[in-house]
Regions:
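Extracytoplasmic/periplasmic solute-binding protein
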Residues: 107-109, 137-179, 220
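A ligand-binding cleft/hinge motif common to bilobed small-molecule-binding domains
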Residues: 64-70, 215, 223-239
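Glycine-centered hinge/linker elements that transmit conformational signals in sensory
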Residues: 176-207, 246
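Long, aromatic- and glycine/proline-rich binding clefts that accommodate carbohydrate-like moieties
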Residues: 291-344, 348, 373, 377-380
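Conserved N-terminal structural module of periplasmic/extracytoplasmic solute-binding proteins
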Residues: 1-65, 366-380
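Extracytoplasmic/periplasmic substrate-recognition and gating elements
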Residues: 234-296
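Short helices/loops that flank or line small-molecule/ion binding pockets
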Residues: 44-55, 124-125, 143-144, 207-220, ...
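Hinge/lid segment of periplasmic solute-binding proteins
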Residues: 66-117
C-alpha cells in the first residue's frame, strides 16, 4: 500500500477539491491511500517551508518560495515531456505557469490561479450606479456610500498592505531599488484615501475576513483590491458577491497570487506524488470536480469554460483580463524574507504611522540586504 500525505491551506478553495479527488483517484489507482492536512493562510504564504517538507509528500504553497526551493533543491522538479510542457504553457492563467519555474526547471504545477481583483455586493451597489473604473470613481462611490452609513472595504493586515503596495507601486527590480520613491509615495497616498473611506475593521481583515463580513452584514458596498475567492460568488441562502477587474487602466499592476503544488525531495513515493499532482492540475479535472468542489482552478480552459462561469456567477470571465496582465513578484532566493520584513512597515505607512518617504527607504534597504546580502530568514 502506497500512502501519500499532502498539506493544503485551511480554506475550502484549497482543501475542497483536494479532498474530493481522493475517492475517484484512489478508486482508479488501487493500492493508493491519500490524506490531506491543513495549515493557516499565513503559514501558506509566509511560514517556514523546510520543516513541513519532511512530513509531507505534496505541499500546496505560494510561488515566491520558488527561489529558495530551487536554490536548496527542496522539491522534485517536474521533468515533463515537450508536449506536456506546451500543454501547461497554453493552459496557463496569466503568468501562473511561469511563476513556478526557475533555473530552467519547473518546481511546481499551477493548481490554483488568483490575483487582486475588485468585488462588490450587487444588491448594494445597484443604487450607486455602474462599477467604478478609476481611482477617482472609487473615491466618489466611497463618499456617497458613507453618507448612507456604508463603506468601501480594503483588507489591510500587514500581508495585504504589502500586496496593495506591490499592486499600485509599480516595482521595477533594477538591482538596488525595488520600488521608486515617487511611486511609493503615490501609492501610499492613494491607499490612504481608500482606507479613509473603508470599514473601520479593515486593518483587521485579510480577504477572507473581508468577504465573510460582506456576506454577513450590509455595510460594505465595494472592495477595489483584494485577492479573489470564487467561493463567495456562488449563490446560496445568503448575500453573494460579484467580482470584477480592478479599477485602474494599468491593470497589469494587479498582484498575481494563486498556489502551486510541489513534491518534496524527502518523499518516499515521488513518482506516485508527481502522477497525482498532474491529475489534479489537468484541464479535465480542473474544469469539472475541482471547481464544483469549491476550488479556484489554475487552468485557463476552466476559466474560459461556459459552464464553470455559469456556476460561479461569471467570476472567471469577469476577472480574466486583470489576471492575464497581472504582476509576477520576483522568485529569487530571499524574496520571502524581504516580503515578511516589509509587511509591517507597509501597514504602518497606510495607517499614517510612517511617512511614505521613510517607507521607501526601508523597503529598498531591506530589498538590497535580502537580494544581495545575507537573508535574515530562510525556508529551513
Amino acid at each position: 500500500m502506497t500512502r501519500l500525505r499532502g498539506l493544503a491551506w485551511d480554506h475550502r478553495r484549497c482543501w475542497g477539491p483536494l479532498d474530493a479527488s481522493i475517492g475517484p483517484y484512489c478508486a482508479a489507482n488501487p493500492g493508493l491511500e491519500i490524506e490531506w492536512d491543513r495549515r493557516s493562510l499565513y503559514e501558506f504564504g509566509e511560514g517556514a517551508l523546510g520543516p513541513v517538507l519532511g512530513a509531507y509528500d505534496l505541499v500546496v504553497f505560494d510561488h515566491p518560495f520558488i527561489g529558495d526551493i530551487a536554490e536548496g533543491g527542496l522539491m522534485v522538479p517536474f521533468d515533463l515531456s515537450a508536449e506536456q510542457r506546451r500543454g501547461f504553457e497554453r493552459d496557463s492563467v496569466g503568468a501562473s505557469w511561469q511563476s513556478y519555474a526557475r533555473d530552467g526547471r519547473q518546481w511546481a504545477l499551477p493548481i490554483d490561479a488568483a490575483c487582486q481583483v475588485a468585488s462588490y455586493r450587487p444588491d448594494l451597489l445597484e443604487r450607486y450606479g455602474p462599477l467604478p473604473r478609476s481611482h477617482d470613481e472609487v473615491l466618489e462611490l466611497g463618499r456617497r456610500a458613507l453618507k448612507d452609513g456604508k463603506w468601501l472595504g480594503l483588507p489591510l493586515v500587514p500581508t495585504d498592505a504589502m500586496c496593495l503596495l506591490l499592486t499600485l507601486g509599480e516595482p521595477r527590480e533594477d538591482g538596488d531599488e525595488f520600488i521608486a520613491r515617487e511611486k511609493i509615495e503615490q501609492a501610499v497616498g492613494q491607499l490612504r484615501q481608500l482606507a479613509a473611506l473603508s470599514h473601520p475593521d479593515s486593518p483587521k481583515w485579510n480577504p477572507i475576513r473581508c468577504y465573510d463580513h460582506m456576506i454577513a452584514h450590509d455595510d460594505v458596498v465595494y472592495v477595489p483590491f483584494a485577492f479573489g475567492y470564487v467561493n463567495y460568488a456562488f449563490k446560496a441562502d445568503r448575500p453573494y458577491l460579484r467580482f470584477a477587474d480592478v479599477p485602474t487602466p494599468r491593470s497589469a499592476g494587479a498582484l498575481l497570487g494563486g498556489a502551486g503544488i510541489g513534491v518534496s525531495t524527502q518523499s518516499q513515493h515521488k513518482q506516485a506524488a508527481i502522477d497525482y499532482a498532474l491529475f489534479l492540475c489537468s484541464p479535465g479535472y480542473q474544469r469539472d470536480d475541482y471547481v464544483k468542489s469549491g476550488g479556484q482552478p489554475g487552468s485557463l480552459a476552466a476559466w474560459q469554460d461556459t459552464e464553470v462561469n455559469a456556476l460561479s456567477g461569471g467570476f472567471f470571465a469577469s476577472t480574466l483580463a486583470t489576471i492575464e496582465a497581472s504582476y509576477l513578484r520576483p522568485t529569487h532566493p530571499g524574496f520571502i524574507s524581504f516580503f515578511r520584513q516589509c509587511a509591517p512597515h507597509a501597514a504602518a505607512a497606510l495607517a499614517g504611522e510612517l511617512q511614505a518617504a521613510e517607507l521607501a527607504d526601508r523597503l529598498n534597504r531591506i530589498y538590497r540586504e535580502t537580494r544581495h546580502g545575507q537573508p535574515q530568514w530562510s525556508v529551513a
